[in-house]
Each structure stands twice: as C-alpha cells, then as structure tokens.
Curated annotation (Swiss-Prot):
Monomer. This is Protein TraJ. It comes from Escherichia coli. Transmembrane segments: none annotated. Transfer of plasmid RP4 during bacterial conjugation requires the plasmid-encoded TraJ protein, which binds to a 19-base pair invert sequence repetition within the transfer origin. TraJ protein is bound to only one side of the DNA helix. This nucleoprotein structure is the initial complex in the pathway to assemble a functional relaxosome.
C-alpha cells in the first residue's frame, strides 16, 4: 500500500474573511474572553460549537473575598446564637448591624455573580 498521511490544518489552505477593523476587534475580544486563539475561536464558531468563556479571575477573587467575609460574619452570629460568654456584651443593636452586614454581603455576592454570568449570556 502507498504511504498515505492524513492532511493537517497547517497543510490546508486558509479561509480568508474580510471584515472591518471594529468587527475584527470584536471577534478578537470574544476569542480572548473564551481563552482561545483567533483561529481556534473562528474554527469552533464556524463548526457550530457553543463557546464557553473563561471566568474572569478578578471576579473569582472578589467572590472568594466576599465568601470569606460571609463566613466570618456567620461565625459571629453563630457565637451569639449559642450564648457564648464572649458575646455577652453584644447588644441587640450590634446583632442587627451584623445581620444587616450579612445581607449587604449577600447582595454584593449576587451582583458579582451577575457580573460573571451576564456578559457570557448576552451577545
């Protein structure tokens, strides 16, 4: 039998696409958001694959910070609920402020989560 080799992408002719500079910039931004090269992004989109973006590391870091804050606030609330002697000096105003702070952190967490999800869901 003859020695047959499989064709590779590098050995195949490229497909040229004409676009305006702002269109190219938009495509490059979407490829970068997906963590892909421009070529890999266009190949995947052209074949109908659903592109999933890479979560922004700043959002992840912020979510971790808020989660830690909620854990600390929850620990304080737990101490108060168990009538721990260390929390005997806490008055009702302090506990209400703690509950308000927990609610504020939960709202902040929701906003950051929407910031992660919303850009990926909209075109």
């Amino acid at each position: 039998m003859a020695d047959e080799t499989k064709p590779t992408r590098k050995g195949s002719p490229p497909i040229k696409v004409y676009c305006l500079p702002d269109e190219r910039r938009a495509i490059e931004e979407k490829a970068a958001a997906a963590g892909m090269s421009l070529s890999a992004y266009l190949l995947a989109v052209g074949q109908g694959y659903k592109i999933t973006g890479v979560v922004d590391y700043e959002h992840v870091r912020e979510l971790a910070r808020i989660n830690g804050d909620l854990g600390r606030l929850g620990g304080l609330l737990k101490l108060w609920l168990t009538d721990d002697p260390r929390t005997a000096r806490f008055g009702d105003a302090t506990i209400l402020a703690l509950l308000a702070k927990i609610e504020e952190k939960q709202d902040e967490l929701g906003k950051v989560m929407m910031g992660v999800v919303r850009p990926r869901a909209e075109p």
